[in-house]
């Protein structure tokens, strides 16, 4: 069987629809490969796609054929090995294989089909079915944004938006309409001239008359301009209202001395995944980074992920700072407020009840969703149990999970931000 492999660069995305159909068809294979890649890769290593392997048997089209079962009565002329009533042993079918092993002299098979998905496709499968819970519209009056969308073709517009194909098509149609009858007459005149020259070569009068008519018709056709201002077509772009929800995500990370370097790395990887998810799925969202030990500070993205500052542990300092920023910059009646907190669970004993009170009275009534991840292989401490009481009071808007190793990051992340059915 012959195979044709199209290796064109596909610069105009002419095969995009076919590719999307293929990705939908083998979504389960691709999603499984993406999940394995996420657990294998570093979270920061998301700047390229992934190679996906699909077993050859899974890409075969269904085929109806005769099975090997059943009994058949066949006459074999010159048979010297079998007599009536004996059963002929079924031939053993050769099977293809792959991987290391010794060479064989029989068997056929098919290699796995391997293809590459882009970074955009990788992230799409990675964050599929994830969303910020309870995202609602707040204060839509006067906060509409606009996005520019294609709205067909216009006869007027900016020269930079000229549609060349539609312009040439319009010009071609106009030339046909204006010169169609002249071209038909010209064609008839040329045929008549050819007939006269062939059958009546001495009829100079008629020949000269037809040649003059041909010249007049040709001049009339050439006077039709190749391109006219009437032909110009432009891509029409209009501004479409795009009501947007304003959302802010608070990222609170414990960098105290009790956090080992491995624990800090897991926390950073969790927040990198969260940051990537937010920027990938939401056009307009503010992210506030807060680092804390005995005191809390709002920092930028670079310092949040790479600063080496450390100290003691007072978790309430981060919650107090978050509440102050909410009151100052993010009023709850205008913003969808989210928070994600990561810690190893160690905290000054007298501070854990304070954390609970701040959350219950000053933060939870105003946020859409609050997540807490505790990174520890040990038994939970006072902070975890205080947060469990918060979860009982705010079951729909508070969630907590435990991380033990880096391999838990992606499954826990999906559990926290899994799309919920709205009833």
UniProtKB/Swiss-Prot annotation:
Q: Where is the composition biased (Gly residues)?
A: 92-107
Which superkingdom heads the taxonomic lineage of this protein's source?
Bacteria
Q: Which residues form the signal peptide?
A: none
Q: Which InterPro entries match?
A: UPF0229 (IPR006698)
Residues annotated as region Disordered? 64-109
Which family does the similarity line name? Belongs to the UPF0229 family.
Can you name this protein? Answer: UPF0229 protein PFLU_5583
């Amino acid at each position: 069987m012959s195979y044709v492999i199209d290796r064109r660069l596909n610069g105009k995305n002419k095969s995009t629809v076919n590719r999307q159909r293929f990705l939908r068809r083998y979504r389960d294979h691709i999603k499984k490969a993406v999940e394995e890649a996420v657990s294998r890769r570093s979270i920061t290593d998301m700047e390229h796609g992934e190679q996906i392997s699909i077993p050859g048997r899974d890409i075969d089209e269904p085929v109806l054929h005769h099975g090997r079962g059943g009994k058949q009565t066949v006459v074999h002329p010159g048979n010297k090995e079998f007599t009536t009533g004996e059963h002929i042993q079924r031939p053993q079918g050769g099977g293809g294989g792959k991987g290391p092993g010794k060479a064989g002299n029989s068997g056929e098979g098919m290699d796995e089909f391997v293809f590459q998905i882009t970074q955009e496709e990788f992230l799409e499968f990675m964050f599929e079915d994830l969303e910020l819970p309870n995202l609602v519209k707040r204060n839509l009056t006067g906060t509409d944004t606009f996005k520019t969308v294609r709205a067909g073709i216009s006869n007027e517009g900016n020269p930079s938006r000229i549609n060349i194909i539609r312009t040439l098509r319009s010009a071609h149609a106009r030339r046909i309409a204006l010169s169609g009858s002249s071209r038909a007459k010209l064609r008839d005149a040329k045929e008549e001239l050819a007939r006269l020259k062939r059958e009546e070569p001495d009829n100079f009068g008629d020949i000269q008359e037809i040649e003059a008519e041909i010249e007049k018709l040709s001049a009339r056709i050439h006077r039709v301009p190749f391109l006219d201002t009437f032909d110009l077509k432009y891509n029409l772009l209009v501004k479409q209202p795009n009501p947007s929800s304003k959302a802010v995500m608070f990222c609170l990370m414990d960098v105290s001395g009790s956090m080992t370097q491995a624990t800090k790395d897991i926390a950073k990887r969790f927040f990198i995944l969260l940051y990537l998810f937010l920027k990938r799925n939401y056009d307009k969202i503010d992210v506030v980074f807060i680092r804390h030990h005995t005191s809390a500070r709002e920092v930028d993205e670079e310092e949040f992920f790479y600063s080496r500052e450390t100290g003691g542990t007072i978790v309430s300092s981060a919650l107090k700072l978050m509440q102050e920023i909410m009151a100052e910059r993010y009023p709850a009646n205008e913003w969808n407020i989210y928070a994600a907190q990561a810690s190893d669970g160690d905290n000054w004993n007298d501070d854990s009840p304070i954390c609970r009170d701040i959350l219950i009275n000053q933060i939870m009534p105003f946020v859409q969703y609050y997540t807490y991840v505790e990174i520890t292989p040990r038994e939970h401490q006072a902070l975890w149990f205080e947060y469990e009481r918060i979860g009982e009071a705010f079951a729909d808007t508070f969630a907590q999970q435990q991380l033990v190793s880096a391999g838990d990051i992606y499954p826990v992340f999906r559990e926290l931000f899994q799309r919920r059915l709205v009833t």
